[in-house]
């Protein structure tokens, strides 16, 4: 999976360098996926040859700004530095259309594509206690609280290597963060299984336990516990037996008497404190090299 994903990413970079169109890039990715790398190289050579006709070397050597940014890091590199809503074109989403996403252009250099936000936006406390289809397709308002959608998160995280960042805030406005390298999920056929790498940050490692586990919701029990974790803890998440983080749980806004069913990050606040504000966001791992 990773080898194919990396090949598709390199092919797209080459296409951008030589000014290939979106349809030409899509043809390259389709050929690579279906018939192999050799056929893809032949198609790519043909397209590049067409682009080089009647062009001087000085023109070809100029960097080409991608007309179809694939994530918020691309948007930042294209010169847009304000946080807010943007349109992107993930590579594996081309046949479906564009995605509207919220870009965080301020945190740690910017370029983050936000995939989840919780806050006090007037929705019911159980707003995130939804069935599989809602988590599959996404819900909410990207300017407020929302879940981007597991299909979309899959499309994003399988086009290149990403890290994920969790930004957490308590009622006293104290903040913590956690970063995990090499974050990606599998598709629906594989129950959106979670994959993450090494942890860093000051929030404590409350997501690492969920690595390798499938997504569960109120109507789909894919955890490893004898009970139904999503029903018990009132959210959609990569539960195992059951959780050390529950960022899609009930919005309980601080301390609560119930056990572990709020927006929990155990390593920082334990199981009786529901965080009033959290964000989950992703950025390409190589951004730290090419983006700064």
Swiss-Prot record:
Ca(2+) binds at residues 221, 225, 227. One of its GO terms (cellular component) is extracellular space. GO terms for biological process: cell-cell adhesion. NCBIfam families: GGGWT_bact. Multimeric. PubMed:10468566 and PubMed:11707569 are in disagreement about the nature of the multimer, PubMed:10468566 finds hexamers and octamers, the results in PubMed:11707569 suggest tetramers. Glycans are attached at residues 173, 198, 214. Lectin involved in innate immunity. Agglutinates all types of human erythrocytes, Gram-positive and Gram-negative bacteria. Has a stronger agglutinating activity towards Gram-negative bacteria than towards Gram-positive bacteria. Specifically recognizes acetyl group-containing substances on agglutinated cells. The hemagglutinating activity was inhibited by EDTA, acetyl group-containing mono- and disaccharides, N-acetyl derivatives of amino acids, other acetyl group-containing substances, propionamide and benzamide. It is found in: Secreted. PROSITE patterns: FIBRINOGEN_C_1 (PS00514), FIBRINOGEN_C_2 (PS51406). Residues 63-286 form the Fibrinogen C-terminal domain. Residues 1-23 form the signal peptide. The record marks 209, 233, 243, 259-260, 271 as: Implicated in ligand binding. The keyword Secreted applies. Keywords: Calcium, Disulfide bond, Glycoprotein, Lectin, Metal-binding, Pyrrolidone carboxylic acid, Secreted, Signal. The modification Pyrrolidone carboxylic acid is found at residue 24. Its main location: secreted. Disulfide bonds join 72-103, 229-242. InterPro entries: Fibrinogen-like_C (IPR036056), Fibrinogen_a/b/g_C_1 (IPR014716), Fibrinogen_a/b/g_C_dom (IPR002181), Fibrinogen_C-term_domain (IPR050373), Fibrinogen_CS (IPR020837). It comes from Tachypleus tridentatus. GO terms for molecular function: carbohydrate binding; metal ion binding. Strongly expressed in heart and intestine, weakly expressed in hepatopancreas. Not found in hemocytes, stomach, nervous tissue or skeletal muscle. CDD domains: FReD. This is Techylectin-5A.
């Amino acid at each position: 999976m990773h080898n194919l994903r990396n090949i598709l990413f390199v092919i797209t970079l080459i296409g951008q360098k030589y000014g290939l169109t979106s349809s030409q890039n899509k043809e390259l990715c389709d050929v690579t996926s279906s018939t192999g790398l050799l056929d893809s190289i032949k198609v790519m050579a043909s397209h590049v040859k067409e682009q080089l006709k009647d062009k001087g070397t000085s023109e070809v050597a100029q960097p080409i700004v991608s007309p179809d940014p694939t994530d918020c890091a691309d948007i930042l590199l294209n010169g847009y530095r304000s946080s807010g809503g943007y349109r992107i074109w993930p590579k594996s989403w081309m046949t479906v259309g564009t995605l509207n996403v919220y870009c965080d252009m301020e945190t740690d250099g910017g370029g983050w594509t936000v995939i989840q936000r919780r806050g006090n936006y007037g929705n019911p406390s159980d707003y995130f206690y939804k069935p599989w289809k809602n988590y599959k397709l996404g819900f909410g308002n990207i300017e407020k609280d929302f879940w981007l959608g597991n299909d979309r998160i899959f499309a994003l995280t399988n086009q290149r290597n990403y890290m994920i960042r969790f930004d957490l805030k308590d009622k006293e406005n104290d903040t913590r963060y956690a970063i995990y390298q090499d974050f990606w999920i599998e598709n629906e056929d594989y129950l959106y299984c979670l994959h993450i790498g090494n942890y860093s940050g000051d929030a404590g490692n409350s997501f690492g336990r969920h690595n390798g586990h499938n997504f569960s919701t109120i109507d789909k029990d894919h955890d490893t516990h004898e009970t139904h974790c999503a029903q018990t803890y009132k959210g959609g998440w990569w539960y195992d037996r059951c959780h050390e983080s529950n960022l899609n749980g009930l919005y309980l806004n601080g301390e609560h008497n119930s056990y572990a069913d709020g927006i929990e990050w155990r390593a920082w606040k334990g199981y009786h404190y529901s965080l009033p504000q959290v964000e989950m966001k992703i950025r390409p791992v190589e951004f730290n090299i090419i983006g700064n």
